[in-house]
Amino acid sequence: MITLGIDPGFARCGYAFIEAKNSAYKIVDSGLIETFQNQEYNQRLSFIYTQLDELIKKYKPNNAAIEELFFSKNTKTAIKVAEARGVIILALTLNNIEFQEYKPKEVKSQITGNGNANKDAMMKMVNLFTGSNIIQDDTADAVAIALAHASRNRIFNDIK
């Protein structure tokens, strides 16, 4: 089963496709969708959508998880991230991918056992769980979101 994790952003959107096999997790692909300030606003949103849509069509995830928007002190940034989340959710919906939203503290708690864990602790656990060496924050967050969702799905499936 392939799970897509997304750390939404306007300038940098982290993504990770992970595969759960038995009790192990393998990263199929992960990275960033990056937009740049010299691009028109609508082009940046379109680029996020088209890149994610291509990745979804390539890897055909069974489900997805996306980080909920937390309130930022910078309203302008929060609005841009919210709009990026909108095109991300559109890409998931048009590809018939069911998704779950997670608060950052939920992901941190599930991955590290501490809802207030820092970036270093998160990255360490992500790399431990996947046997990888991810050093980019947004990518690591996307992997963590995918891991949290895949793990939660596994628990619910075991209960059934």
From Swiss-Prot:
InterPro entries: RNaseH-like_sf, RNaseH_sf, X-over_junc_endoDNase_RuvC. GO terms for biological process: DNA recombination; DNA repair. Keywords: Cytoplasm, DNA damage, DNA recombination, DNA repair, DNA-binding, Endonuclease, Hydrolase, Magnesium, Metal-binding, Nuclease. GO terms for cellular component: cytoplasm; Holliday junction resolvase complex. Binds 2 Mg(2+) ion per subunit. The keyword Cytoplasm applies. The active site is at D7, E67, D138. Its cofactor is Mg(2+). Mg(2+) 2 binds at E67. It comes from the Bacteria. Mg(2+) 1 binds at D7, D138. Its EC number is 3.1.21.10. The keyword Transmembrane helix does not apply. It is found in: Cytoplasm. It catalyses: Endonucleolytic cleavage at a junction such as a reciprocal single-stranded crossover between two homologous DNA duplexes (Holliday junction). Homodimer which binds Holliday junction (HJ) DNA. The HJ becomes 2-fold symmetrical on binding to RuvC with unstacked arms; it has a different conformation from HJ DNA in complex with RuvA. In the full resolvosome a probable DNA-RuvA(4)-RuvB(12)-RuvC(2) complex forms which resolves the HJ. This is Crossover junction endodeoxyribonuclease RuvC. It comes from Brachyspira hyodysenteriae (strain ATCC 49526 / WA1). The lineage of its organism: Bacteria, Pseudomonadati, Spirochaetota, Spirochaetia, Brachyspirales.
